[in-house]
């Protein structure tokens, strides 16, 4: 496995700048998740690293080697797309074996069998090994595509929302499996997702992309607790961070335009009165929807709370984040 370095990478599509001077180091053995809304440049970043597309400016290094001019095969990267890409006329087993049968690798038969079996078990498709790829459900095909990447030992795995087409239970299972495969093998993984839970649970680092610019890079915890802007703060956390006018509570510093309060950073029982508008019991926690001076706030409370819609609850900020008129964090 290898470190991947992007140095001032820029990519334009006619006059649209999809990646704008992006510099980023994906450390060897890390699990980096790229975050950003649609169009932020996540897929473009993966395509540049894979060699499917060329940057207009800047350099990409994998394992210290410059990648300019090298084909995807020469880069030895494994990519999993959101949409499965299988050989339809081959069986699941043949699809999984395919990458190992490359003449360059000359993997021994016993080794191929062992790897295919192990991966098929992890991905819960062992019972479908002899089926034709076309005889699978969408979720099964996607698992085979993931398997085709995992049987290899590339320099880096590039995955673009690989779990988004799977049902919730399988997604939760595979999240744990992928993370343990990565942690166990020391693989380097660059991963795109819109799923907050995937990002928080799997990433060693997250990179926040905003209109083609990398605006923050750090551990999920760092980005969660110390976001550089409202934009970065809104990328992690569910329910989302509450953004309110800064003067809605006393104590805002000069130049503060907005206060950001994570749902769990609102103390209840003292402070200002707010109205409970909805109580959502989710089992392990309860969400309170509050109306406070014409603003809606979401906070969390005790799972067995007796609060009901129409009640009054006192609230005050705990660990507030302040942002200026441009949405940038104030120290
Ligand atoms: N082949 C292309 N031709 C023209 N424009 C493109 C092309 N590929 C991407 N773009 C543009 O570049 C920008 C970044 O696209 P990209 O696919 O990287 O976004 P993304 O963050 O992956 O979004 P999504 O979450 O929707 O996949 C977008 O504005 C997109 O329209």
Task: Name every feature range the model reports, one short phrase each.
Residues 251-331:
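Non-catalytic connector elements of ABC transporters
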């Amino acid at each position: 496995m290898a470190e991947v370095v992007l140095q001032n990478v820029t990519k334009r599509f006619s006059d649209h700048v999809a990646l704008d001077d992006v510099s980023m180091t994906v450390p060897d053995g890390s699990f980096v998740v790229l975050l950003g809304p649609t169009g932020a440049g996540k897929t473009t970043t993966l395509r540049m690293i894979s060699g499917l597309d060329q940057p207009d400016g800047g350099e990409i290094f994998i394992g210290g080697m410059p990648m300019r001019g090298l084909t995807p095969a020469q880069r030895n990267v494994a990519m999993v797309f959101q949409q499965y890409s299988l050989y339809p006329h081959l069986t699941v087993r043949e699809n999984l074996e395919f990458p190992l049968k490359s003449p360059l690798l000359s993997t021994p038969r016993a080794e191929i069998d062992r790897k295919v079996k192990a991966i098929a078990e992890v991905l819960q498709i062992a019972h479908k090994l002899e089926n034709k790829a076309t005889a699978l459900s969408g979720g099964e095909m996607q698992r085979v595509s993931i398997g085709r990447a995992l049987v290899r030992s590339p320099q880096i795995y590039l995955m673009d929302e690989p779990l988004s087409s799977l049902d919730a239970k399988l997604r939760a299972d595979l999240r744990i499996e992928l993370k343990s495969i990565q942690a166990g093998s020391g693989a380097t993984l660059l991963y795109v997702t819109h799923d907050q839970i995937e990002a928080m649970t799997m990433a060693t680092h997250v990179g926040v992309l905003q209109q083609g610019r990398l605006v923050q890079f750090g551990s999920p915890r760092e980005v969660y607790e110390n976001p550089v802007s409202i934009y970065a703060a809104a990328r992690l956390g569910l329910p989302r961070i509450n953004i309110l006018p800064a003067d809605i509570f006393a104590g805002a510093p000069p130049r503060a335009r907005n206060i950001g309060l994570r749902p769990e950073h609102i103390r209840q029982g003292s402070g200002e009165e707010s109205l409970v508008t909805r109580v959502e019991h989710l089992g392990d926690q309860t969400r309170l929807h509050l109306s406070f001076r014409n603003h809606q706030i979401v906070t969390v409370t005790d799972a067995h709370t007796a609060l009901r819609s129409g009640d009054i609850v006192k609230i005050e900020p705990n660990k507030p984040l302040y942002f200026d008129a441009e949405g940038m964090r104030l120290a």
